[in-house]
Design a protein with these regions (language model features):
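N-terminal signal peptide c-region/cleavage motif recognized by signal peptidases
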Residues: 15-20
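N-terminal, active-site-proximal structural segment of metallo-dependent hydrolase catalytic domains
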Residues: 21, 236-349, 405-428, 439-440, ...
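Extended non-catalytic accessory segments flanking core domains
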Residues: 21-277, 283-297, 327-329, 359, ...
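Structural recognition of the beta-strand scaffold that forms the well-ordered cores
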Residues: 64-67, 96, 146-148, 193-194, ...
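Solvent-exposed loop/turn segments at secondary-structure junctions
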Residues: 71-73, 84-85, 101-104, 199-201, ...
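Metal-dependent phosphoester-hydrolase catalytic domains
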Residues: 216-224, 228-249, 314, 356-383, ...
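Structured beta-strand-rich core segments of catalytic domains in phosphoester-bond hydrolases
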Residues: 317-398
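Active-site His/acidic residue clusters
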Residues: 386-388, 394-417
Length: 545
């Protein structure tokens, strides 16, 4: 921001703006002309208008917004960081003399010489905006007081703890369920960022939290009113009235107790590392929090078989995780790890846990095809009381990150899509080669592909069914959120013969909807299972006798 003349700054800071000043002098520049570039930059200007938003004081924007009374209105930011917050109020007409500049492309008046109080003119009526809206119209309303009369849904909270902002959308939250690459423009037109009247990092207190200290995705807000602007690549609203949220997506209860003999679940442990300072915990305190969170998740899932992803590829890490989980469990509910025949050389591995009091482990195998960077592991299980075999294969396909410049680049399904598709093909061939007496196999884990992408198309073509899909509405079929879009990356997949035995299934939305600062390494880690990972666990109950 641009500095002030020291004497002027001192006077404005100490002395209130004079009331009933003479504002009749001519030569004022229309705000619309300033915004349109008619007036040269870095020159002295005089503007007048009605104060619509005051963002003065410590850790605020350091200024206020003016708006003219034309139709359509035009608005402008006045940068006045030394002006006390009690000197201005919305509805006040003022005349400002200063320097016209553009800050990061946004027009504003700074280096203030004089601010005159021209009396109270009444609060400006907000301009109604309904999403989806064309970006051109939103650009024309920058600096203007607006109101969103419709309900908006919280669809992104990644930057809430970092910058005090939420991503909102019209028509419900943004879902990644369609064909690859579809809906991108429509999603862009449906979004607005709710900011907090500042651009400071790590705000304290964190705004917009509920009584539980969270703000979950899926919550709603209606009648949002404030000043529209564009910064950091997005249209943003700085509210002039405190937003009132509705907890439309409350924290869910654990999956109900399973009446069926067998429950299988996925569980992403978000880099459970004993080696501190690597991908996982940075300190012993963070590791202890991570252990507590994961133990709470396992207790809530109450699964007989758990397919884990993102465990440090060290035997000691898996052993420690199992020990920590078992500490709070009674004897008949404790877990044992399936020994991975060949976990490969990647920094992380997949793993299988099971309850030996309820299940017998018959055989294990690993898919050592070099196409896999994390070798899948398969365990064949039979109920301790007897019954048919069931295989569970823990998998973790290549992520959509670390993209190459050429080759397997992003063509609408994220980079490495071709590799993930080849991993799916290899997995199917490997499972088919291991079939024991026609026993089916449940593929469990992180495919890193959305439901309509090539790897899932290939798995479906081979007869694999999304076991949790039957019991979930489309709006609930997600396990991960990226850039405000929710989609399913984690699956339990099996043949129709297994799907017929499903008695209940679901996704336990304990992670993806929660802000990251509640995680084990966050600014305000929550107790219990909340934000124990960035992926939600998927579970299924099977009538398997």
């Amino acid at each position: 921001m641009h500095g002030w003349n020291r004497l002027t700054a001192f006077l404005l800071f100490v002395v209130a703006i004079p009331a009933a000043a003479d504002c009749s002098r001519g030569g004022t520049a229309p705000i619309a002309d300033l915004r349109a570039g008619v007036v040269a930059e870095n020159g002295s200007v005089t503007v007048d208008g009605i104060v619509t938003g005051v963002f003065l004081g410590r850790n605020r924007l350091g200024g206020f917004y003016l708006q003219d009374d034309r139709q359509p209105p035009s608005g402008l930011f006045v940068y006045a960081p030394r002006l006390g917050p009690g000197n201005l109020r919305p509805g006040q007409r003022v005349q400002v003399e200063g320097r016209f500049v553009r800050f990061h492309g946004r027009p504003q008046v700074s280096r203030i010489d004089t601010i005159r109080d021209c009396g109270y003119a009444g609060r400006a009526e907000p301009v109604a905006v309904r999403l989806p809206e064309d970006a051109g119209r939103l650009d024309a309303l920058q600096g203007v007081k607006v109101r969103f009369p419709d309900a908006l849904t919280v669809t992104g909270n990644y930057e809430l703890g970092r910058y005090g902002s939420l991503r909102l959308s019209s028509g419900g939250r943004l879902l990644r369920t369609g064909a690859p690459g579809s809906g991108a423009n429509a999603h862009a037109d449906r979004q607005i960022v709710l900011d907090d009247g500042s651009y400071r990092a790590e705000p304290d207190p964190i705004p917009y939290l509920d009584a539980q200290g969270t703000r979950r995705l899926g919550d709603t807000v209606q009648g949002l009113t404030g000043i529209l602007t564009h910064a950091f690549g997005a249209h943003r609203l700085h509210p002039t009235r405190e937003p009132s949220f509705i907890a439309a997506n409350p924290r869910p209860e654990p999956p109900p107790a399973a009446p069926a003999p067998l429950r299988v679940s996925t569980l992403n442990v978000e880099n459970y590392f004993l080696t501190l300072g690597q991908r996982g915990a940075r300190s012993q305190a963070e590791l202890q929090r991570q252990r507590g969170k994961l133990a709470a998740v396992v207790r809530g899932l109450d699964a007989d078989v758990l397919a884990l992803t993102e465990v440090e590829n060290r035997r000691e890490a898996l052993t420690d995780l199992v020990r920590q989980i078992n500490r709070g469990l009674p004897q008949g509910q404790r877990y044992a790890a399936v020994a991975h025949p060949d976990s490969g050389t990647d920094a992380i591995q997949v793993a299988l846990l099971y309850r030996p009091e309820r299940l017998d482990l018959v055989m294990t195998a690993a898919d050592v095809d070099p196409v896999h960077n994390r070798a899948p592991v398969l365990g064949w299980f039979r109920a301790s009381a007897g019954g048919p075999l069931l295989g569970v294969a823990a998998v973790h396909f290549k992520a959509k990150v670390g993209c190459p410049d050429t080759g397997d680049i992003d063509r609408g399904q994220g980079c490495w899509n071709r590799l993930r598709t080849n991993q799916a093909r290899s997995l199917l061939e490997w499972i088919d080669s291991l079939r024991r007496d026609g026993a089916p196999v449940v593929i469990a884990g992180d495919i890193n592909a959305y439901a309509a992408e090539d790897p899932l198309d290939l798995l479906r073509a081979a007869g694999k069914t999304n076991l949790a899909g039957r019991d979930l509405r489309p709006s609930g079929r997600y396990t991960y959120v990226f850039h405000g879009e929710a989609g399913q990356l984690d699956y339990l997949l099996a043949a129709p013969a297994v799907a017929k035995r499903v008695t209940a299934a679901g996704v336990w939305h304990i992670n993806a909807d929660e802000p990251p600062f509640l995680g084990y390494s966050g600014r305000r880690p929550a107790s219990g299972p909340w934000r124990s990972s960035d992926h939600d666990p998927v579970w299924v109950d099977l009538h398997w006798r």
